Structure formats: structure tokens, C-alpha cells
Amino acid sequence: MDVLEIMKIIPHRYPLLLVDKILEMELGKRIVGLKNVSVNEPFFQGHFPGYPLMPGVLMLEAMAQVGGILMIKSLGLEIGKYAVVFAGIDEARFKRPVYPGDQLIMELETISLKKTISKMKGTATVNNQVVAEAILMAAARELESIKK
């Protein structure tokens, strides 16, 4: 699945769209996504000048976006009508830095998936080395319901 298809499913846009491609997907079970980490990412301007590292919270957000795609597709939710929002994060660990030029591969495996709530185990790797992992909980909400 390419980025244009991804943008039909989740509402995230630049500079917070953090998934470029879906490589694999088994509905209700697992998904694998890819983020090409460019030196031009806006977060590198301040994290850290001269020593660019991808912030850990953005690795979690990237995993969550990939998991959100799996959730929306698996539950058969109407495309373009829902956003998946964080409900919780457990056991987050950051193992290695992510640099400009890296390809961040994110694999999410479903632990539970019910109605509009999910729990997934996420693992992010670069060059087959784990850089981050976490248990992510999320809720699907109609976009209209999250407006102020």
C-alpha cells in the first residue's frame, strides 16, 4: 500500500504523517509499515542541531499510525470517517538511535481487537536491529466526535 492509499485511511498529514508504505497486512493479526527517515524531517531542526536523532515519541507515533491502519481495515470502519487515537502505552523501550537516512520498519501484532478498541505489540527496527518497542492501546473515534 503506497502513501496515497495510506492518506485515504488515516487523517495524518505532513509533518505528522510518519508512514510511507505498508509492506504486509493480515487483517486482524499483523501489519508491517515503513518510514523513510529523511534529513529534511522538521523535527531534526531541534532534535538535536548537529546531532540529528529521531525522537522516541515519534517512533511510537509512527508505530501507532501503522497500527491504526490495521485497526481501521480490520474492523471494516468507513474510510475517511475515523481517526485512531492513543488510549495508552505500556512497556515502551528505546534500544538504539534512528538517524537521517534510516528506514524504520514497524511491525504491529494484535493482542486484542474489539469494536473500537485495540491493543497491539509494536516493534520498530532499522537494519534488522530493534530500535523501539511498546504495547500500544488505541481507540477508533469518528472524526466529527473529536472536534472541540
Curated annotation (Swiss-Prot):
One Pfam family per UniProt: FabA
GO biological process terms on file: fatty acid biosynthetic process; lipid A biosynthetic process
Cellular component annotations (GO), alphabetically ordered: cytoplasm; membrane
Domain of life: Bacteria
Tagged with keyword Cytoplasm: yes
EC id: 4.2.1.59
Disulfide bonds: none
Keyword Lipid metabolism in annotation: yes
UniProt keyword list: Cytoplasm, Lipid A biosynthesis, Lipid biosynthesis, Lipid metabolism, Lyase
Stored Gene3D superfamilies: Hotdog Thioesterase (3.10.129.10)
CDD domains from the UniProt entry: FabZ
Class of enzymatic activity (EC top level): lyase
Major localization listed first in the record, in broad terms: cytoplasm
One GO MF term: (3R)-hydroxyacyl-[acyl-carrier-protein] dehydratase activity
Catalytic reactions of this protein: a (3R)-hydroxyacyl-[ACP] = a (2E)-enoyl-[ACP] + H2O
Record-annotated active site: 47
Cell location: Cytoplasm
Entry-linked HAMAP family: FabZ
Family according to the record: Belongs to the thioester dehydratase family. FabZ subfamily.
Function comment: Involved in unsaturated fatty acids biosynthesis. Catalyzes the dehydration of short chain beta-hydroxyacyl-ACPs and long chain saturated and unsaturated beta-hydroxyacyl-ACPs.
Protein name, entry field: 3-hydroxyacyl-[acyl-carrier-protein] dehydratase FabZ
Chain's gene name: fabZ
